[in-house]
C-alpha cells in the first residue's frame, strides 16, 4: 500500500512540475533585446542609447527593481525602443502600465507638434512576456515582432 501511495504521489509531483514548466515565455534580457531591435529593425532616423536615468524619468509607476535599456531617434521621428526586465510577471504588469502611459504621452505630444508621427505611434508594438515588457515604435513592425518573439517567446 505504501509503495502504491508513493508511486501515485511521485506521479502527481511530476505532473505538477510539468504543469509549472515553460509556458513559452522566456525571461527578457533588456540590453540584448534592445540591441537586437536596434540592429535588426529598419528605422528612418539614427537611434542613440538612452541612459537608465533618462528612462526612469520618462517612465512613471515602475516597480522598485528593474533593468531598462532603450534607444531614441536622433532626428524628428518618434521612433523608440524601450525594453524593461523586472523581477517577476507581476512587476511586468506594472511596467506595461508605465509603458502605456509613456506611449499615450508621446501621442499627446505628437498630436500637438508632429501630427504626421501619429500613425507611427498608433502602430507601436507594446508586448509583455516573461519577466518584462517591450515598446518599439517603428514602421518595420513585422521585423520587430519577429525579433521580439525570438527573445520573448
Predicted regions, residues:
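Short, compositionally biased low-complexity segments enriched in polar/charged residues
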Residues: 47-78, 90-95, 121-122
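Positively charged n-region of N-terminal signal peptides that target proteins for export
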Residues: 1-11
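Post-signal peptide N-terminal segment of mature Sec-exported envelope proteins
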Residues: 28-46
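C-terminal motif of bacterial Sec signal peptides marking the signal peptidase cleavage site
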Residues: 15-19
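Short Gly/Thr-rich strand-loop-strand
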Residues: 89-129
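Second-shell loop/turn segments in exported
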Residues: 80-88, 132-137
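Bacterial signal peptide processing site
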Residues: 21-24
Amino acid at each position: 500500500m505504501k509503495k502504491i501511495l508513493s508511486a501515485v504521489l511521485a506521479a502527481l509531483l511530476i505532473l505538477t512540475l510539468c504543469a509549472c514548466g515553460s509556458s513559452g515565455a522566456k525571461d527578457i534580457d533588456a540590453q540584448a533585446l534592445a540591441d537586437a531591435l536596434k540592429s535588426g529593425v529598419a528605422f528612418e532616423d539614427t537611434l542613440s542609447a538612452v541612459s537608465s536615468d533618462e528612462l526612469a524619468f520618462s517612465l512613471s509607476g515602475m516597480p522598485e527593481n528593474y533593468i531598462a535599456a532603450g534607444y531614441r531617434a536622433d532626428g524628428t521621428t518618434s521612433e523608440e525602443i524601450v525594453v524593461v526586465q523586472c523581477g517577476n510577471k507581476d512587476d511586468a504588469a506594472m511596467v506595461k502600465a508605465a509603458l502605456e502611459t509613456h506611449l499615450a504621452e508621446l501621442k499627446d505630444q505628437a498630436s500637438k507638434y508632429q501630427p504626421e508621427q501619429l500613425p507611427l505611434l498608433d502602430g507601436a508594438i507594446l508586448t509583455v512576456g516573461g519577466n518584462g515588457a517591450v515598446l518599439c515604435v517603428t514602421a518595420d513592425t513585422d521585423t520587430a515582432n519577429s525579433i521580439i518573439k525570438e527573445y520573448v517567446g
